[in-house]
């Protein structure tokens, strides 16, 4: 109840003020939603201290999604308060699965993200940079969140080089959505998150169910 009251208060006050101060309240509303979702998932996450990279390279390709009914009822904060039911179907694009994530083991102890469709590239050697995944303007927020929810890195503390040394090497993650524009309504962001989670689990040998994928993607 406190969550629902807080987000509504922030939103209504921000709407009434309708100025720079109001924008701060609107931002606070969405930050509250993000924190509620993230913490609810992160609190149940297990940091996999014993896992090791088991594949030199691994690629996951997934289809797009089209909604037949119930769209947005599964979207926070509505689904947090009321639940949600959506009827959808998986589709290919000209016979291809356009959502693609490739993981490759690196000799160097670092994390590298490469987004081909967004033309962005980033390299990380400090764990704090990877543990901050709440910035909506960060082009790699999704990839960082995948590392956290899969338990590859912990929520707080630790040393990235020690973790990667134990894993057996660094990680290169390439993400791409081929020939599908952002905002298409075909579920590219959530499906890309699912591909990242699935690729990470497969690469380090973590067993999972389809329900595990769904729960981790919600984060």
Please give the residue ranges for each predicted region.
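ATP-binding N-lobe of GHMP and related small-molecule kinases
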Residues: 2-186, 198-211, 215
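Short, conserved phosphate/pyrophosphate- and ester-handling motifs at nucleotide-, phospho-/glycolipid
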Residues: 189
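Acidic/histidine-rich catalytic neighborhood of metal-dependent amide-processing enzymes
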Residues: 218-219
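Active-site signature of alpha/beta-hydrolase-fold catalytic machinery across serine-
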Residues: 195
């Amino acid at each position: 109840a406190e969550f629902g009251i807080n987000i509504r208060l922030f939103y209504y006050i921000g709407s009434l003020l309708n100025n720079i101060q109001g924008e701060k309240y609107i931002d606070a509303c969405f930050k509250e939603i993000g924190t509620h979702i993230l913490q609810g998932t992160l609190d149940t996450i297990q940091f996999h201290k014993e896992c090791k990279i088991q594949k030199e390279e691994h690629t996951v390709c997934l289809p797009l999604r089209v909604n037949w009914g119930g769209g947005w009822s599964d979207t926070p904060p509505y689904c947090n308060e009321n639940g949600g039911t959506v009827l959808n179907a998986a589709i290919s694009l000209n016979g291809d699965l356009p959502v693609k994530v490739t993981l490759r083991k690196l000799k160097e102890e670092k994390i590298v993200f490469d987004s081909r469709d967004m033309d962005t590239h980033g390299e990380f050697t400090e764990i704090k940079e990877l543990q901050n995944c709440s910035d909506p303007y960060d082009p790699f927020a999704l990839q960082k969140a995948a590392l956290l929810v899969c338990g590859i890195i912990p929520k707080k503390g630790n040393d990235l080089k020690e973790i990667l040394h134990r894993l057996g090497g660094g990680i290169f993650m390439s993400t791409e959505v081929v020939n599908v524009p952002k905002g298409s309504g075909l579920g590219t962001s959530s499906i890309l998150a699912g591909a990242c989670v699935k690729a990470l689990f497969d690469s380090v040998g973590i067993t999972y169910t389809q329900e595990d994928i769904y729960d981790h993607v919600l984060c």
